[in-house]
Amino acid sequence: MLTTKRKPAGVGEILVEEFMQPLGLTQAALAEAMGVPRKHVNELCNDRRAVTAPTALILARVFGNSPDFWLNVQRRTDLWETTHSPSEMARIERAKPLNVAS
């Protein structure tokens, strides 16, 4: 279980600060390169859209890295948000481990 209190960098922060800004890319230019509407890129940049497998494959193709990179960024954020949500943790704690005989 994650124990850090600091929220990990989200997809939007990494996308903008580590990829778009150094390359001088606008949201419109990235949207064109990705073949998606600008709204899609805007939502990614503002952490209002989660990275799915197809989006991870597209980002990896555009930036020359791996889809796992993008999915792992999303996974870290999802896990952090879940473990820091009292309602989600209460729901998880209601789950009962199975007693499976060996």
Where do the protein language model's features map onto the residues?
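Residues within the helices of the helix-turn-helix
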Residues: 17, 28, 57
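Residue-level detection of the helix-turn-helix DNA-binding "recognition helix"
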Residues: 35, 46, 75
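Short, basic-rich loop-to-helix N-cap that marks the start of a DNA-contacting helix
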Residues: 48-61
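DNA-binding alpha-helical recognition surfaces that contact promoter or target DNA
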Residues: 43, 57, 72
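Short alpha-helical DNA-recognition segment
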Residues: 24-43
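Short, charged recognition helix plus adjacent turn
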Residues: 71-102
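A short, Lys/Arg-rich alpha-helix, primarily the initiator
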Residues: 1-25, 72
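The alpha-helix within a helix-turn-helix
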Residues: 20, 31, 60
